[in-house]
């Protein structure tokens, strides 16, 4: 298919699938877009193509700054904000010839698991259950996932803090890849939790995700959390060791975390996991059970750390420095509250306000030692658990602590881990809306139980779709389950390689 025809198809799909609410903003003037595509077509015909994405439409989650489109974070408080600059990842992909397809819908500021917490309305999954009711698209990058699943763009970028790229990928039948923390620049990405936020990629297949990843996997001096050239060189040298280099062509040692086999796992997802393991064994890989004992504490630690960072990051949205301004006084009527309390109260959604309060509490003098500090300790234990089971050492800080060595001596060293992405197939949106808001939020938090550990450790992880029979969960088209591949820090290419071998398999 020609690039122009592919672009026209994406634009047509944006119109025909508008009811899914995947996009907040799309290209309004198509003439310049078509000219860009024609130029890319000429470069391709003459052998001067800039990259694999040259002339292709890439969508960006609406918390990634773009100069030519508003950046709202799906929040009323940023409803009128347009960034004066492009995020680094937008610049990198534009330099590679990619064309911005638009800005995708999300949970407000990335806080949510079902794309319900958006001031622009919920994102709807393109798949339907037997009764014709709409399914959750996952969150918070649900708009990016649906836009890819319905061919409204070639690929899309999202952000993954605790699973926000991988969970929507599992629900929509796409590939969602979260790179190692620090490889991809966060400059120009609106912060939720700085130590966890990672720009992720959503695509139809792992090969496309790899193409996009290689473009954005570069040093950016403007982002202090981005890996330096020295650290990148250290990772590259580490991966050139013969024992590690051979993994790209030989059989692998694949670990199965026993703690992920929870009672709440749905029968269809459990079956997909088991059959995926069996398939990899048939391909010549060896399977080894491993233990990640701190897994049971990871989710609780995440929901202390992420809101704590969010409460700090979102303090600037007060109607004075950033954000829309409410000019009416609050209920107290005090002059000093005119541009602050009312603005934040009206501008933020319920879930964002809930997390700001939770974060402020965990950082308070009375709670910081019992909550925030303890959560940081749990995070370190989660990292130690992963270091203990992987054959490759952590290349940035390779010296193992005593606990790592003791754990490692008791179990097999593996190259990657395989586990479910989500404990169940996507729920119905109506059920999520009708449930009491507090209990609905708590249930949504538990959807991250399998994705949060890799986020806390900063590891690369990908969700790939496999086909199974999910009709036991009441869906005529819910035959896709997400299987997650997790690798050691810096093993991004290996994670994508294993993902590519597994994606789209029918069991």
Curated annotation (Swiss-Prot):
Give the keywords, sorted: ATP-binding, Ligase, Mitochondrion, Nucleotide-binding, Protein biosynthesis
- Give the CC-aspect GO terms: glutamyl-tRNA(Gln) amidotransferase complex; mitochondrion
Enzyme Commission (EC) number:
6.3.5.7
Question: Where are the catalytic residues?
Answer: 61, 140, 164
Q: What GO terms describe the biological role, i.e. biological process, of this protein?
A: glutaminyl-tRNAGln biosynthesis via transamidation; mitochondrial translation
Q: SUPFAM superfamilies from the entry?
A: Amidase signature (AS) enzymes
Q: Name one Pfam family in it.
A: Amidase
| Reactions the enzyme catalyzes | L-glutamyl-tRNA(Gln) + L-glutamine + ATP + H2O = L-glutaminyl-tRNA(Gln) + L-glutamate + ADP + phosphate + H(+)
Molecular functions per Gene Ontology: ATP binding; glutaminyl-tRNA synthase (glutamine-hydrolyzing) activity
Taxonomically, the superkingdom here is: Eukaryota
| Localisation | Mitochondrion
The subunit field of the Swiss-Prot or TrEMBL record says: Subunit of the heterotrimeric GatCAB amidotransferase (AdT) complex, composed of A, B and C subunits.
By sequence similarity, the record places it as follows: Belongs to the amidase family. GatA subfamily.
Q: Which PANTHER family match?
A: GLUTAMYL-TRNA(GLN) AMIDOTRANSFERASE SUBUNIT A, MITOCHONDRIAL, TRANSAMIDASE
Tell me, what does this protein do in biology? Allows the formation of correctly charged Gln-tRNA(Gln) through the transamidation of misacylated Glu-tRNA(Gln) in the mitochondria. The reaction takes place in the presence of glutamine and ATP through an activated gamma-phospho-Glu-tRNA(Gln).
Instruction: Provide the protein name.
Output: Glutamyl-tRNA(Gln) amidotransferase subunit A, mitochondrial
